[in-house]
């Protein structure tokens, strides 16, 4: 597994697809953003959460969307330290632009994100992340296994470990 794969989105609507491309590459499955855009039904407005879940499923990832809000409307960042990473966070940039970022690591007071807008991997303070985070998170339910043939070409796109163990 590669750690923190940097992927830069091609245009403003590609952030969700770029995040999924980054996570796929993290597990050794390199796919073009254009292919993931198709899988996620990305349109001129971008990709919605359902589209990302469906595309992730087609890639063999079992994911679910969760929302973390406290009664006062603020995000509860404590569960972030318990989520399996990488995960995709829905954020609002500059108080107006809906965007997705990949969370690669969470420490006590810092979070490592890959922002497809810049294509960079960076550590930021959790309180700064919390200011932009909508509370929506796409997290995986199990470790995927990617199979490749002896030429390094994907023979069978990622299968979830639970499919193998419980089929």
Tell where the protein language model's regions lie, with residue ranges:
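Conserved active-site-adjacent core of cysteine acyl-enzyme catalytic domains
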Residues: 1-130
């Amino acid at each position: 597994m590669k750690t923190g794969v940097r992927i830069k989105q091609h245009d403003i609507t590609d952030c969700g697809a770029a995040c999924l491309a980054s996570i796929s590459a993290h597990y050794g499955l390199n796919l073009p953003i254009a292919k993931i855009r198709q899988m996620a039904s990305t349109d001129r407005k971008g990709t919605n959460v359902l589209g990302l879940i469906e595309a992730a499923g087609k890639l063999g990832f079992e994911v679910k969307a969760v929302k973390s809000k406290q009664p006062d409307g603020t995000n509860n960042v404590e569960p972030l330290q318990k989520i399996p990473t990488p995960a995709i966070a829905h954020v609002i940039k500059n108080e107006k632009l809906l965007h997705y970022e990949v969370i690669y690591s969470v420490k006590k007071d810092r979070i490592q994100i890959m922002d497809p807008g810049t294509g960079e991997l960076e550590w930021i303070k959790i309180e700064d992340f919390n200011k932009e985070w909508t509370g929506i998170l796409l997290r995986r339910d199990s470790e995927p296994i990617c199979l490749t043939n002896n030429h390094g070409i994907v023979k069978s796109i990622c299968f979830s470990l639970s499919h193998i163990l419980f089929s």
